[in-house]
Amino acid sequence: GNLPDALEAAREIVGEPGSEPVAPFSLTTAAATDERLFDSELLFALEEGKMQDNIDVYFGESVIKNGITNSSTALSISINNRNKLFAQQDPADDDYRLKLWFQETNSATAVMPGKYVNVGCIPLIRLSELYYIAAECSANQGLAYLNTLRAHRGLAAMTEVTDLQAEIAKEYSKEFMCEGQMLSLIHI
């Protein structure tokens, strides 16, 4: 894509690294179960009144109570894969997404995504996505943009990286779990 134009568009909302985004948007500052989608970061979302009904068959309480091993529709992730995806890079890391987005099950080896439990909208564009775009497009300030967002996910700043694009891809994988934005990352 056109990296200079993408960076310019992202900066219109997020500003320079370390600065606050344009109001009314703000970055999350804590892990709150009533705000699993980091609502203050949603730039555009579609309201879906029957979302809970639609996802219950795959991630709902009845699936958990009846056991994911007894369900033909339950969608789960292995604990090993979750732990690989959210591996701590720093002992101080306390990833909000890891705390909020998984439900325990009757399985000793799997958990269920809980990102959309009691949520009534489908995110289309998030503030975090603009930070990742800015990080990807800015060779000089990419790490600073990434660290700004990491700080708002309960993660320690990275002081140096050998492959910034790979680190951005890791964060995309965590941030957009159960969403379609990962398709835009295929070019990396």
Where are the language model's segments positioned?
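Acidic/polar-rich alpha-helix caps and helix-coil junctions
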Residues: 1-63, 67-72, 77, 83-186
